[in-house]
Amino acid sequence: MHNSSAPAHGRTALVVGASGIAGSALVTLLAERGWEVLALTRSGVSQPGVRSISADLTSPESLAAALAGENPTHVFFTAWSRQDTERENIEVNAALLRNLLNALHHSPVEHVALMTGLKHYLGPFEAYAAGEMPDTPFHEEEPRLPVANFYYAQEDVLWAAAERQGFSWSVHRAHTVIGHAVGNAMNMGLTLAVQASICKELNRPFVFPGSETQWNSLTDMTDSGLLAEHMLWAATAEAAGDQAYNIVNGDVFRWRWMWPRLGAYFGVDAVGFENEPRPLEVQMRGMETVWADMAARHGLAEPDLARVSSWWHTDGDLGRNIEVLADMSKSRLAGFTGYRRTLDSFTQLFDRLRADRLIPRPLAVLGVPKAT
């Protein structure tokens, strides 16, 4: 059994990318477990019991200055920077991790946990699912694909630093993370909530944007809270380190089952796959003024549609023409028993988005009777 619920004793966590979809969940979990938490972002984090550090991961000088007096024992790296090509992704994202670990050469680091994803098995965006793919569900021991991939470059940086600096490591391969974050580059949960809210506002159907394969195939996802638990487990459980692990919720579903249930939550007419994909980048084109008007009338916290939607990412995810799901046996056999029901991950996120005024609340909640 995993024991990451045990209180921290003199442990200090450095969460890199602390305002993102995975990092924010880690910050919350670690603070709840009694860790001293250092949250490293460019914008800062305001949370009780958490000390924010502002630094630029692209600048060794900025990192050296920001971390000069810090002594983290555990590092959780969840940051990445999207570039135009995979060559640039490799150059930039490998450097982000390398710069951070170099800046910690003086620190008593015991473990570094790195978040990546299932593009480890699928390939990067520009060569996505090209060539022969491993069979599903994906297993951690699959060999690397013969293509350039910034996940591979980050692993190589991690392993070299572990050998040089003497810490243990873990890699966490997540699939489509569901969680709370604003301005995140890959945020399907918030994106679908915004799509459904706009459809509700305009009395339009809630149209599935993806492929026939995704509509009918089995798939899975990763709750950000579960990802945080998994990274903490691997960082602290005896004999769990120095391994790469898949991390998904533990259930599987088909979008043809899930989509009507998401539509029912928002009270919109859910429409499934019909003939061809209908991408969100097309469906939601020109909706910036609609969203700004909704934000003004409903008192929403973010009027900028680009800050609460990532149409391109959701289109790419739901437009895949292959089945995508991951095996969790390795984590289970090592002692991690965490689980989430994906429908609950969605609805709990939607509840929080409403409470935080990121999407409109139902009229009844606002004190206005619903029309009959």
Regions found by a protein language model. Name each.
Residues 165, 179-195, 225, 234-245:
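Glycine/proline-rich active-site loop of Rossmann-fold NAD(P)-dependent oxidoreductases
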Residues 35-46:
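Conserved glycine-rich Rossmann-like NAD(P)H-binding loop of the short-chain dehydrogenase/reductase
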Residues 45-49, 53-102:
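NAD(P)H-binding glycine-rich loop region in Rossmannoid oxidoreductase-like domains
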Residues 6-33:
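N-terminal Rossmann NAD(P)H-binding glycine-rich loop of SDR-like oxidoreductase domains
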Residues 75-77, 88, 95-150:
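Conserved Rossmann-fold NAD(P)-dependent oxidoreductase catalytic core, especially the SDR/UDP-sugar
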Residues 142-175, 180:
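Active-site Tyr-X1-5-Lys
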Residues 228-315, 319, 327-329, 333, ...:
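Mid/C-terminal beta-alpha module of Rossmann-like enzyme folds, strongest
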Residues 194-225:
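A conserved pocket-lining segment of Rossmann-fold NAD(P)-dependent short-chain dehydrogenase/reductase
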